[in-house]
Amino acid sequence: MARYDNIAEFESDLNGKGLRVGIVMSRFNQDVCEGLLSACTEELQKLGVSPELIRIATVPGALEIPLVLQKMGQSGKFDALIALGAVIRGETYHFELVSNEMGAGITRIGLDTGIPIANGVLTTEDDDQALARMQEKGSDCARAAVEMANLLKVLQ
């Protein structure tokens, strides 16, 4: 543990060796989602996660992501989970509904299962914003998943 102002700090790292990672990706706004997935899996492998220990499930849209995350989390087969998708504002209230319900579901499942979930579902005003953010967000999710899986192991 590191020390910060004489307080012991739990340390985590970004070593993904041996970690089992599940990814749930929406197929809606597929170009953006595939960009997120590419960046995410590339970063996971850079961090040492073996491709053989990465499992991907695709779902029709963002609202279907939480259910599959829940099943993966309950399976005991994963150290961390990642949600990938893109909800892009349209002309109706549907954007808020999908974004809020999906986000709340992901948070609840992480708390209920005790499995860390990196939320990589972009919520943007337009396609250009989503395309501009997909690479960085995909990589960020990979790092967050690995760091949180390792932190939870330290806390056990």
Swiss-Prot record:
The gene is ribH. One of its GO terms (molecular function) is 6,7-dimethyl-8-ribityllumazine synthase activity. The keyword Transferase applies. Belongs to the DMRL synthase family. The keyword rRNA-binding does not apply. Pathway: Cofactor biosynthesis; riboflavin biosynthesis; riboflavin from 2-hydroxy-3-oxobutyl phosphate and 5-amino-6-(D-ribitylamino)uracil: step 1/2. Its EC number is 2.5.1.78. This is 6,7-dimethyl-8-ribityllumazine synthase. NCBIfam families: lumazine-synth.
